[in-house]
Amino acid sequence: MKKKYRIAVLPGDGIGPEVMREAYKILNILKYHFSLPLEIEEFDVGGSAIDKEGVALPKKTLLGCENADAILFGSVGGRKWDSLPIDQRPERASLLPLRKHFNLFANLRPAQLYSELKYLSPLAFLIVIKNGFNILCVRELTGGIYFGQPSGRSKTNNFEYAFDTEVYYDYEINRIAHLAFQLAQTRNYKVCSIDKSNVLNSSILWREIVKKVSLSYPNVHLSHLYIDNATMQIIKDPNQFDVLLCSNLFGDIISDECAIITGSIGMLPSASLNEKKFGLYEPAGGSAPDIEGKNIANPIAQILSVSMLVRYSMNLKNIADKIDYSVISILKKGYKTADIAHDNNYLKTNEMGDVIADALISGE
């Protein structure tokens, strides 16, 4: 174990600070109950940073992240800053620069439907009745059509047109594929690679390299699906999937599809990693300004983001499992926040944080 783990905490805007307060309860238990050598420092980001310092990602915040072993991120954005130029708004001017600065090429989005919450899924009950489902979307985050050049708009002969370019280098596909197979070895040993190799040259290269990488992992079963078929198969039977390996564009689409069939995005964490396993960990949802300050936001995604941080950047699987089990145990006992309750009997944000913290300490 390292002598010290430095965590940069960036609560951000909207419900970010509210759910981060509950994550602090878990961090403090890790530090004082489990004796993990954590050093935690908080920094401004997003709209709150714009209000205080004029920019969404202040130099002090970036330096604090550089000196950390991982970033625990809340959420950014809100109507207050929508009048700013697009490249100065909280989302575009903070989260994207952090991803680029730290070369966070891999986005991990778990989508799990807990058996206690099957009624939340929009899918037919018979589809999810087995054991819920547990899918991990592994999305390449720094290449592909979102970053390819040329990209733009133009006019010719009285016609206006727009264009984007899908570019993937072999090393980009290679590293995300290796990560997907390595993660599958910690789960159910299945990788399904998503592409459109019947049409796109970039997908042809994608499939070729994924096949080559798979030879290094003979105990992992590899399958391939075109993106259109994959979106249908997830609805038809999500239980058939374990790890989904996706390009930037396809991963953007399919990870959101996986999220919505769980019934509540407030349950879902995410991680963005670089090759050294430095990571930015955040809830999959947004800043939800409509419920800001009402103490009804679901803190589970933020708490599970702590679990992912402990699992991937600190490599402490046993501690991460304890956090995950604490969440499962309180769900089994019937504790719910407003977004996952089917009646008015639900816990406030701080109350949910308390019961999860108590479960983590007691191990029950």
From Swiss-Prot:
It catalyses: (2R,3S)-3-isopropylmalate + NAD(+) = 4-methyl-2-oxopentanoate + CO2 + NADH. GO terms for cellular component: cytosol. Its main location: cytoplasm. Its EC number is 1.1.1.85. The keyword Cell cycle does not apply. SUPFAM superfamilies: Isocitrate/Isopropylmalate dehydrogenase-like. Substrate binds at R99, R109, R139, D228. InterPro entries: IsoCit/isopropylmalate_DH_CS (IPR019818), IsoPropMal-DH-like_dom (IPR024084), Isopropylmalate_DH (IPR004429). Catalyzes the oxidation of 3-carboxy-2-hydroxy-4-methylpentanoate (3-isopropylmalate) to 3-carboxy-4-methyl-2-oxopentanoate. The product decarboxylates to 4-methyl-2 oxopentanoate. Homodimer. This is 3-isopropylmalate dehydrogenase. It comes from Buchnera aphidicola subsp. Uroleucon sonchi.
